[in-house]
Amino acid sequence: MKALLPRTLRLIRRPAWVAATCLLLMGCGPEARRAPGGVTDRQQQEPAISGSGNILAVLVEQRGRPTVQLRDLRTGQPLPTRHLNRHQPHSSPSLSWNGRYLAVITQRGNRRMAVIEDRLTGRAHPLRSPGNHDPVRLSLSPDAQRLALQVSDRGRWRVELLDLSGVLEADRPGGLRLSTDEPTP
């Protein structure tokens, strides 16, 4: 009977191949579920979530312009931004670990620039990229000590890394010590 079956059918009859095929067709893990507080009725784009998973940033249309909106995922409540409403449209939101810092690209006149809002102190930190190139996308490191900027430079894409350690205080996961001279009890 083996001789009558094509080689590929003989391979499929083996239990290991059957199991592997089933895994590929069904997926490797449990089905993802919608998190509470994670959905609103507005059209949303470019999601970014804080490292702690507690704050969501999305772009929504306000007065015909993309505007960043923050939401506390524990309560479902919107969170205010202090400086960003003056400079729109927004693009490419990125959050630090606890959501203290929100980085976004804004439009000021005919120039695009990266701005980081410190939600704890209320300060805005406008950043110009070296060479004064227009930013296209950005990504803030979880501790807010580095910013990766994709820029357009004479028709070519380039990524620039900015060191923010002299500008921003680090945003570390809760309970993480910076240093200690005393032994832990």
Predicted stretch roles:
Residues 65-69, 111-115, 156-162:
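Structural motif
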Residues 25-27:
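C-terminal motif of bacterial Sec signal peptides marking the signal peptidase cleavage site
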Residues 39-82:
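Post-signal-peptide N-terminal segment of Sec-exported extracytoplasmic proteins
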Residues 37-42, 82-87, 128-131, 175:
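Surface loop/turn motifs at the tips and blade-to-blade linkers of beta-strand repeat domains
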Residues 57-63, 103-109, 148-154:
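Beta-strand C-termini and the immediately following turn/loop, strongest in propeller blades
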Residues 29-31:
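Bacterial signal peptide processing site
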Residues 47-55, 93-101, 138-146, 182-185:
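Blade-terminus and WD-like Trp-Asp/Gly-His loop motifs, strongest in beta-propeller folds
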Residues 73-76, 118-122, 164-165:
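Short loop/turn segments that connect beta-strands within beta-propeller blades
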